[in-house]
Amino acid sequence: GMDQSASLRCRAGHALELDCRTGGVEQVPFDLAGAGLALLVIDTRAEHSLVDGQYGARRAACERAARLLGVELLADVPPGELDAHLGRLAGCGQAGAEELVRRTRHVVTEIDRTRRLVALLEDDRPLAGAKLEEVGALMSASHDSLRDDYECTCPELDVAVEAARAAGAHGARMTGGGFGGSAIALVDTGEADAVARAVVRAYAEAGFAAPAFLNALPSGPAGRLA
């Protein structure tokens, strides 16, 4: 799974690209420290609970959409053919068709965003300027899709992401399974505290409990300390 792979198969200064179909991984250059950047992890302190079946409901919707489209997985839908496939779902005449459209649009565009991000990180340009803007924009677009099409965020996650962006984060998004948990913001190292303070203020204004923070860098796998 994703969490296990991130814990055991990662490499310092790299992001881990995981193919969930095959279990294969690729190490992608992601030297944040060398670029003067950090990932600010924002623990929303919102209860991370999927017990009401929402996670399972989304998986079921994706599997149903794949069956209707005649593909094994929604990952098999080419991004260039997405609109045509969404039109088929919208016109299928079945209950919940609009939900299937949203879920499918998220899955296909999220895979495309991931591939575009990997291609960006693998090119030879420094992680700065236009390249950094593109990376941040892809992160933010991912959150917007998770919020609007996959509908797995929560108010605490959305406030954290919006506040981080407004305070100067290059990009921000929820991470993990959603419905609570944490968000991440790509920030200049020297601006991490200012972004964190902005999130704390936004939480206070919204009446949420104060969040917690961690400045993270891509690191090696878990191992024995002694």
Regions found by a protein language model. Give the residues of each.
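C-terminal nucleotide
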Residues: A12-G171, L186-A226
